[in-house]
Amino acid sequence: MKYLVFALLAGGAVWFYLIDGSKLDEGMVREFYAQQARNTYERDPEALCKQMSGKYRMNIQSHIAGKVNDASYGKSLACEQIKKSFKFFEDMGERAGGILTIEYSYDIRRLDIASNNRSATVEITTTLKMGEEFMQIFSESTDRIERSMRQVVLVAQDSKVRMRWTPGAYAHPEQYFQAQ
């Protein structure tokens, strides 16, 4: 009898963890992006990287200083780029005497949950401003989000990014980001 109860409890736990733990709903997707915004405001690249799946892939087309660049990244390279970007923001903030703040906003344009409730396709726009006029990064992305093992993660991203800035005494972002 003990073994039967144990087997039922173990089976229930496995079902809850593997099956029910992979169901995704609109609220979870919206909370994922809200957490991404909090991580950005906190300037926490590690937390942003933890929101990516181990199989994460990004295709990006960037428009910087009149030049177009196409690139693809896996998770490790994407995380490296995020860390470099935050380091750049920190360096520019220090050069400006700590007066350059980061503003981040996002708009979910479309959110489609798959019929099996395990993934979602999200069309989203984001804007990141540093010092209001110093630098602005605009992106339009189509993201694929999944829930697996009770965690919501970003699996794939197709993005178009535009950067513009006011040339000034602090830095030349086009040189920094194109060198990367």
Regions found by a protein language model. Give the residues of each.
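Short, low-complexity N-terminal intrinsically disordered segments enriched in polar/charged residues
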Residues: 2-54, 58, 62, 66-72
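Low-complexity, intrinsically disordered terminal/linker segments enriched in charged
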Residues: 132-180
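Short regulatory "switch" loops immediately downstream of catalytic or recognition motifs
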Residues: 55-63, 85-92, 148
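Short, solvent-exposed polar/charged micro-motifs at secondary-structure junctions
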Residues: 69-70, 115, 165-170
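Short hydrophobic/aromatic-rich beta-strand segments that constitute the beta-sheet cores
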Residues: 58-59, 122, 154-155
